[in-house]
């Protein structure tokens, strides 16, 4: 694969970097992208009409693809109290990918997703309550019969304690044990 990418990062922040916001749009064209096409085993040729919602043989082929998207990130302080420094951190990601030869969506592209974390720093402790939100996926790879998946939200809890040369991390991912699909 050979990829050509155009991207730029725009960075706004306070002079002391106490808060910041970054935006990174990007566009990528890929030559010889390894993608799958539906293959007819009987005729040993590409399928004339795509089979959907059933098993089909796939063959990997070098094709042309394009991806574009936007990554946003930011952080800001909320308060300094007797219980430490509180802040917010966030990420938002959008990616769109298409096979330029077939017009099909690229396989396994993450839908619009975001993370928002409430953070606390206090006497060696670094804690976070994180919310993860993912939009439903409704435009995947038709050639691979990629299934639609519903959107979901998760809550993660993390804590770490640091000493001079050692850090101990704890975490509970998916705190409420919610069923979700990637």
Task: Walk through the language-model features, giving the residues of each.
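Short, glycine/charged-rich beta-strand-loop motifs at protein surfaces that mediate ligand recognition
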Residues: 24, 142-148, 155-159
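Gram-negative outer-membrane beta-barrel transporters
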Residues: 25-30, 47-139
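Outer-membrane beta-barrel translocator domains and adjoining extracellular loop/strand segments
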Residues: 1, 33-40, 95-107, 138-146, ...
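Residues that define the transmembrane beta-barrel architecture of outer-membrane proteins
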Residues: 2-6, 64-70, 108-114, 151-155, ...
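Membrane-embedded beta-barrel scaffold of Gram-negative outer-membrane proteins
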Residues: 2-57, 66-68, 173, 180
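Transmembrane beta-barrel domains of outer membrane proteins
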Residues: 9-13, 24, 73-77, 117-121, ...
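C-terminal beta-signal and adjacent terminal beta-strands/loops
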Residues: 29, 36, 135-139, 160-182
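Outer-membrane beta-barrel channels and translocator barrels
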Residues: 3, 15-17, 77-83, 122-125, ...
